[in-house]
Amino acid sequence: MKKLLFTTALLTGAIAFSTFSHAGEIADRVEKTKTLLVGTEGTYAPFTFHDKSGKLTGFDVEVIRKVAEKLGLKVEFKETQWDAMYAGLNAKRFDVIANQTNPSPERLKKYSFTTPYNYSGGVIVTKSSDNSIKSFEDLKGRKSAQSATSNWGKDAKAAGAQILVVDGLAQSLELIKQGRAEATINDKLAVLDYFKQHPNSGLKIAYDRGDKTPTAFAFLQGEDALITKFNQVLEALRQDGTLKQISIEWFGYDITQ
């Protein structure tokens, strides 16, 4: 009964960000300031980017805004290049990363994550005229434009590709257009959004891995109480259809399951 009443409270209104027992340092600061500091790129559409009016928006941005709203917190975004994102978290420049980041085994050794709030997969992008790359194996010895610390970059390196380090997806795709890179591995949803915005890009998805990689919010280890709060709200947003609604607004279908 207590669990039911708590879930109902989550579904119908905001939850007070109450005092935690055994709270971490970040949770203590958030409780005092009532402000959540969020690390995000702001350049990775459709997850985190600026619209035509200059407003920071995107799927990940709107999900964490809704979570913060339910917790009775204000949100302050700290825009950061991807390759500096986890360094920023380590330095406590922000409390959490909201940037389509997945809890890989390597990251789980150093960081803690919420339950997933969406699922996507990896694809290889090449020029439309290039039919020589049809799998990860075909990347061996080829030039692949990747963020140095991303999982996609590690996948490309594992496949034997020559890595051209870039800041993000947009730069990767530009290098392919220019002929300076032959391919890139990235998130399928981000690539499809780019194609939607640039229908004459001259690029294509050369290979779709067909996987469903989970995405979650990343925290420093030791913030279990704060993560528990996040997980409770995410579950409530899943139950009342809010997560699905946000997903449909951005993608036309549900990516949260």
UniProtKB/Swiss-Prot annotation:
One BP annotation, GO: amino acid transport
InterPro entries associated with the record: SBP_3_CS, Solute-binding_3/MltF_N
Signal is among the record's keywords: yes
Source species, domain of life: Bacteria
Keyword Phosphoprotein annotated: no
Localization (cell): Periplasm
Pfam families linked: SBP_bac_3
GO CC terms in record: periplasmic space
SMART domains, per the entry: PBPb
Residues making up the signal peptide according to the UniProt record: 1-23
Keywords, sorted A to Z: Amino-acid transport, Periplasm, Signal, Transport
Main function: Probably part of a binding-protein-dependent transport system for an amino acid.
PANTHER family in the record: L-CYSTINE-BINDING PROTEIN TCYJ, MEMBRANE-BOUND LYTIC MUREIN TRANSGLYCOSYLASE F
Similarity comment: family membership: Belongs to the bacterial solute-binding protein 3 family.
Protein name: Probable amino-acid ABC transporter-binding protein HI_1080
Organism: Haemophilus influenzae (strain ATCC 51907 / DSM 11121 / KW20 / Rd)
